[in-house]
Each structure stands twice: as C-alpha cells, then as structure tokens.
C-alpha cells in the first residue's frame, strides 16, 4: 500500500543529543540502544472507518518527533505501520451507512494519507493493510499451532484459533498489569473472555473462522480472517526482524493489543522480547472526555485545515502537553498555538546572532532528547522569541539556522 510524500528537511547545525524515551515495559526513561546505522520502528495504524481525529494525530505526531530525532542523530529509520482494513468496526460502520466496507476503508485511508501529509508527518516505508498480509499472518498462525502455542476450539460450526497466554514465560511484561486489570481491559477492548471452548478467558483470537456475510481467506486451518493482534505481530516482524527497536501506539493499546502482539511474535519466532522499547502516548480529550469514535466527540484534522488553521499550529497545539500525559484539546489550546506560531515567525525575521541561535537550538535538542519534552522545547523558543522581538539584530544566516532547526526537529514551519 502506498503511503504519502516524505517532508523535506535539512540537516541541523551543531551536535545532536542521544534520544531517551520512556519504556512502558521497564517503567523508566532510558536511552535508546540502537545497534548499527538503522533504527527500526513499528506503530499501529488506523482502522479506517472514520476520519483522522486529533487523538489519532497526536499519536502519529509523537512518533514523527521520534523519527525526526533519530534522523538528527544520524540514523536511517526503517518504519512500518499497518492498516487494519478488515475488522468488525469497519464492517459495522459500512453496514450502518449502507456502503461497501472496502469502499469505506479506501476513502478513509486516502483521507488519512492527506491528513498526515498536511501535518508534515514522516511516512512509514512499509504501509501495510491486513488484507495484503494474509499469507504471512497465516504462516505465523501455523507456526504457533506447530509449536503448541495455539489451539483450535472444539466448535464444529466456528473452529476459531486461539493463542495461549501460557505460550511465553514473560506474558504480562509489556503492560505490567495485574490479572484483574487484564481481565477488565480484555473485556472492554475487543476481547471475548466468555467464548466457550477457550482454555483461559484471556487467550486471544488469532484466526476467526468464516461467518456468513464476513470476508474470508483460505488457510490450512480453514477459511476465515485474522485476529487483530497477530496482524501486527506478522507485519512488524516480517519487515523489521524478530526483535526491533520501538513498538508504539496509544496508551489504550498497551493491553491487550501490544501485550498480545508481542506474545504471539515471541512464541512463534522464539525471541525473548519483540521490541526493545514500548512507547505509548496519552489520550486526547475534548472538554474533559477522551476523544472517541464511539462517543462522537471528535475534532477532525481535515476540518481544522479547511477552516483555515495552519497545520503547524495544530502541531504546536498537540506539543503543548507532554506526549505521555492525557490532555485536553480546546479552542483555547488552538488559539494559544496560533498566537505562538505568529510570534515565532515574527521573531525569526530578526532572530539575534548566529551564536545566540545555535545556543537556542542546542537547548531545544536537549529538551527533545529527554523523553520528547516538547513543553520545555517550546518554553526555550518562547523565551528566545520574547527577547528577539525586543531588540534582536537581523541576520539572514541566523534566521536560516533557526527555521531549519524548528522545521527539522519539530516539524513547524516558520
């Protein structure tokens, strides 16, 4: 599947700072330990049944920042992202709206691409729909069955395939949740704990046997379609290797999705840990309530842009809070971001001396290197802008250095 164009950035003068990120599995901020010249990153993509809202955008903007810091540190980045283009929410929305689910998916994927391009988000090199990956998914299901890590339920009508939570010794290491928490989230987030025939209520579906009216693909274990978690296990490891650097997504994916994606890959491939760092973003709310398709309290990226909002202001609004924290979006947040963008642009015309700007850039780098502290980076630039608007001197070279740094590191165009 085609992604979207790569935004143009230039190299930033000065010395980059090594990136440190909070790892959900280890529960601490730690320096990325990247071996070789290429960093590998997998971020879970959308289920394409509605437009890109700011909750989605905040997640992809976070991993865009990570991508930019990796580039600044001299790494190449091998980035993969899936699209869950065959799943129940897509079927349900298509039925509600009286459209073909494939057409609905295609239209929303196209809109997602457009939104990501507008926001200057670096695209994945591997942008893969579940339907494109059926063969590799069935291979992983078969590997789990062969290893005794999965089983077929005793149901002649619907012989679904499940992965056992006992297949790996370290199940639970990624989320660090208690059994009680797992059971709660599993039931709330697409699990089926009461499915008859399962060995454990937490065992996860990896192949859903064909039901009338649903799409199906042939497999060695009968016609059907893939489960949600194993889709990412297969897509990620087939493109990034059995163990890669960063697995990312929203905090609501920590369990069950990321826990099971890791467990399936580890059991099938015989590795101890699928990702070296599990990075999760906080939820974006509107008036105190998490943005959610089911609740309908959404702010859409394309509608903001159609209303004349500068995409750089959207980025600054999202970055005004720390990526790991749950936070609110509001008209006030957007208004503040728009005013900030205008101040920075005005200040960039008379920014100060080259040496002063290099010090500003150095401090922005330090902030972003420490678990993407965008609030601190913004504060550094706010302080610079205040001084520059006071009595700074004009310097075309300094302006170029500043604009290059802010665009390359933050994706904000001055």
UniProtKB/Swiss-Prot annotation:
UniProt keyword annotations, A-Z: ATP-binding, Ligase, Metal-binding, Nucleotide-binding, Zinc
Binding site for L-cysteinyl-5'-AMP: 44-47, 59, 82-84, 228, 250-252, 284
Transmembrane segments: none
Cofactor requirements of the protein: Zn(2+)
E.C. no: 6.3.1.13
CDD domains: CysRS_core
UniProt keyword annotation of Metal-binding present: yes
Note on cofactor: Binds 1 zinc ion per subunit.
Sites where the protein binds Zn(2+): 44, 232, 257
Catalysed conversion reaction: 1D-myo-inositol 2-amino-2-deoxy-alpha-D-glucopyranoside + L-cysteine + ATP = 1D-myo-inositol 2-(L-cysteinylamino)-2-deoxy-alpha-D-glucopyranoside + AMP + diphosphate + H(+)
Motif ('ERGGDP' region): 188-193
Gene Ontology cellular-component terms listed: cytosol
GO MF, one annotated term: cysteine-glucosaminylinositol ligase activity
Keyword Nucleotide-binding carried by entry: yes
Family annotation (SUPFAM superfamilies): Nucleotidylyl transferase
Motif ('KMSKS' region): 290-294
Subunit note: Monomer.
Entry function: Catalyzes the ATP-dependent condensation of GlcN-Ins and L-cysteine to form L-Cys-GlcN-Ins.
Homology family: Belongs to the class-I aminoacyl-tRNA synthetase family. MshC subfamily.
Protein name in UniProt: L-cysteine:1D-myo-inositol 2-amino-2-deoxy-alpha-D-glucopyranoside ligase
Species this protein is from: Corynebacterium aurimucosum (strain ATCC 700975 / DSM 44827 / CIP 107346 / CN-1)
């Amino acid at each position: 599947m085609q992604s979207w164009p790569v935004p143009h950035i230039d190299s930033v003068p000065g010395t980059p700072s090594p990136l440190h990120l909070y790892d959900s599995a280890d529960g601490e901020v730690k320096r990325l330990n990247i071996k070789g010249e290429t960093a590998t990153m997998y971020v879970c993509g959308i289920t394409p049944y509605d437009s890109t809202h700011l909750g989605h955008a905040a997640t992809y903007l976070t991993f865009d920042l990570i991508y930019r810091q990796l580039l600044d540190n001299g790494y190449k980045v091998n980035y993969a992202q899936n699209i869950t283009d065959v799943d129940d929410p897509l079927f349900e929305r298509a039925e509600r709206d009286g459209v073909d689910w494939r057409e609905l998916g295609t239209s929303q994927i196209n809109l997602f691409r457009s939104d990501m391009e507008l926001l200057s988000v670096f695209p994945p090199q591997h942008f893969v729909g579940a339907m494109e990956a059926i063969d590799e998914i069935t291979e992983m299901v078969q590997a789990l069955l062969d290893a005794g890590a999965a089983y077929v339920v005793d149901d002649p009508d619907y012989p679904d395939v499940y992965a056992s939570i006992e297949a790996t010794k370290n199940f639970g290491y990624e989320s660090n949740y208690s059994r009680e928490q797992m059971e709660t989230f599993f039931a709330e987030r697409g699990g089926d704990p009461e499915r008859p025939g399962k060995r454990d209520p937490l065992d996860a579906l990896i192949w859903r046997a064909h039901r009338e009216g649903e799409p199906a693909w042939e497999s060695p274990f009968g016609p059907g379609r893939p489960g949600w978690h194993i889709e990412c296990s297969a897509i990620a490891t087939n493109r990034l290797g059995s163990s890669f650097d960063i697995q990312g997504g929203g905090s609501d994916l920590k369990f069950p999705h990321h826990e099971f994606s890791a467990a399936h890959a580890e059991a099938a491939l015989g590795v101890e840990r699928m990702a070296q760092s599990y990075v999760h973003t906080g939820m974006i709310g509107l008036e105190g309530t998490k943005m959610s398709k089911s609740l309908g309290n959404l702010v859409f990226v394309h509608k903001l842009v159609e209303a004349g909002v500068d995409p750089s202001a959207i980025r600054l609004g999202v970055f005004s809070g720390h990526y790991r924290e749950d936070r609110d979006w509001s008209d006030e947040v957007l208004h503040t971001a728009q005013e900030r963008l205008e101040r920075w642009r005005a200040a960039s015309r008379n920014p100060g001396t080259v040496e002063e700007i290099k010090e500003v850039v150095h401090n922005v780098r330090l902030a972003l290197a420490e678990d993407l502290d965008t609030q601190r980076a913004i504060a550094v630039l706010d302080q610079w802008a205040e001084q520059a608007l006071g009595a700074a001197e004009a310097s075309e070279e300094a302006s170029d250095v500043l604009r290059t740094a802010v665009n390359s590191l933050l994706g904000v165009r001055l």
